[in-house]
Amino acid sequence: VDMLANIGQHYGEISSNPYKPMFNRAVQAPYPPGSVFKLVNGLIGLEEGVVTTSTHYPCSMGYHFGRNKLGCHAHKSPLSFEESIMMSCNAYYCYILRDLLENKKYGSIGIAMDKWQEYVKSFGFGQKLGSDFPSELGGFIPGSGYYNKVYGKGGWKATTVISLSIGQGEIGTTPLHMANLCATIASRGFYYIPHIVKDSDNVSIDPKYKEKRYTMVDTTHFPKVVGGMYRAVNSGFGSGGTASIAAVDGLEICGKTG
């Protein structure tokens, strides 16, 4: 309390601290979201119809394209949609992203890329969520303009950006963005802007914090992802579920490893 009350005289000490106590990583630091982001691409794939719960894809220790490979760990093959979440298969989501970006209904990869970006932003990514945390960072979700600038128009294709399928590459998200994604899935398709104060006597709470914000993915698709998350945790050791360690007897827990 004394430190907070007299922060001015301690500012030099605080600002030079190598652990940066004034830097709130939860809302100010962008990170690649990793495999948790597969849930977003899976939901977009379901909405766009490029994948269903009965779609099976093979995985031979990764996704192979030309002489290149985006690697994966050892697990059964082929996998269904739920199993791809349960076992966190990289190749499965490479197939989904490639089918999204090469979808002929969009006419060009640039248009398809921007549609993907629009979907992702509807989950709150690539922008400030609008929370009451100070100095919130918006993160970054790339679109065709970014890749045209880097590679030149016509100089890139789906496999150029294939790492986006597993939450790597140029994506930048804050931990708050990721927590919000989990809340969105738990709510089956909508989220509230994260905020600190829920209610307070004689204080008017901004109504924006009570507004449901839906993604562009139909709510009927979310239980399909939840099913895979449930199996990731509760299928038992030796099943291939990557989150078995999170299981707790007597509780129904869903999860996704990153």
Regions found by a protein language model. Name each.
Residues V1-S35, V40-G258:
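Beta-lactam-recognizing serine transpeptidase/beta-lactamase-like catalytic domain environment
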